[in-house]
């Protein structure tokens, strides 16, 4: 009886322990699922929001690889077997290229690796990654054409392209109040109130959400205005009035966009991130709210760039600013060398493209710079954005080397040389001279501390010897 009782007690204790262990595993699994996108170690816990997720995995979140493959196969079979091929070579070439791109996009959306973002759906960001690959291949193709063939190839996309742009008058009368115009003295100001004003505001609002730092946004905004001043002898549309540069652009449009962006960042960093499955919410109002929040981030990471903390972070931040400015300049130079008017839909599509890939690229760059333990290589979208920016610049260099090599005015060159020298001087002082000086002082203080400790030990030994001698005499 005693042995059987002992066995029962042991079996009951084992079952209870197994139950507790399974419960703990379940809690850990839910916790890991909820923190799938936000957990990056203890070092980033202060900048990362806490996420609670009930782990619901519905039809919306599944891969659907077989479904996409079936639809794609049926579509290709329909075109092959039931549709008669037209005898138009140009039309067939366009349709074949578009079909090839669509097949690649279907493969990428279902099979490519997920990025750091999961809202509104991971497939959305995989789609834009594949679009960036297609765009880079298109740029490489344009790069390997002659200047004439490349410009005429744009007619293949839109017959209205491939024509030299008409010359326009920029700058002109810069008086805010024109007393010579009796009917409307403020006509110069009203002329600037066009569609580019909300475009500037919206652009910098989105850039602030990408960069998530007020200082970096302001530096990029101000530096681009300096670049416009410096390069207005190359591109006429850079020639603007002083108040258009500093009041309309920097203060009003860019500044207000950055301000609204920072307020949105504050809200995103403070809001709770609690996710429930749609069918687990009892009320219709809660369901509608959940659908709306599907278009907000799954979790939030506050970017702390800290450029002065180390040489690596300083060079990374300088590189980010440089690539940002180069991408901004490419917008204007590509329009100029490929003969695309500013209002063309391809220009707008390029901006929409960078809006969607820029945020992912910035997050991947920040993770690579800030968290090498979990991110040992640069992210795929950041790699593609860097390659696209460089390729666009190479197209500009090849298609119009004369314009881009026009020498800067002497006073502009002096200003840029002075600025570069100041930045290099500060870099050498901050990360070399200052660090060496601080290290030397620290070593010197350590040596002094050791000498003082050795002296105190020696004095203690001498005093102890004297005490022992006194005791011996007594």
From Swiss-Prot:
Pathway: Phospholipid metabolism; phosphatidylserine biosynthesis. It is found in: Endoplasmic reticulum membrane. GO terms for biological process: phosphatidylserine biosynthetic process. InterPro entries: PSS (IPR004277). GO terms for molecular function: L-serine-phosphatidylethanolamine phosphatidyltransferase activity. Disulfide bonds: none annotated. It comes from the Eukaryota. Residues 448-468 have a biased composition (Basic and acidic residues). The chain crosses the membrane at residues 63-83, 97-117, 127-147, 314-334, 336-356, 377-397, 404-424. Residues 448-474 are annotated as: Disordered. Its main location: endoplasmic reticulum. It is a multi-pass membrane protein. GO terms for cellular component: endoplasmic reticulum membrane. Residues 84-96, 148-313, 357-376, 425-474 are cytoplasmic. It catalyses: a 1,2-diacyl-sn-glycero-3-phosphoethanolamine + L-serine = a 1,2-diacyl-sn-glycero-3-phospho-L-serine + ethanolamine; 1-hexadecanoyl-2-(9Z-octadecenoyl)-sn-glycero-3-phosphoethanolamine + L-serine = 1-hexadecanoyl-2-(9Z-octadecenoyl)-sn-glycero-3-phospho-L-serine + ethanolamine; 1-hexadecanoyl-2-(4Z,7Z,10Z,13Z,16Z,19Z-docosahexaenoyl)-sn-glycero-3-phosphoethanolamine + L-serine = 1-hexadecanoyl-2-(4Z,7Z,10Z,13Z,16Z,19Z-docosahexaenoyl)-sn-glycero-3-phosphoserine + ethanolamine; 1-octadecanoyl-2-(5Z,8Z,11Z,14Z)-eicosatetraenoyl-sn-glycero-3-phosphoethanolamine + L-serine = 1-octadecanoyl-2-(5Z,8Z,11Z,14Z)-eicosatetraenoyl-sn-glycero-3-phosphoserine + ethanolamine. Belongs to the phosphatidyl serine synthase family. This is Phosphatidylserine synthase 2.
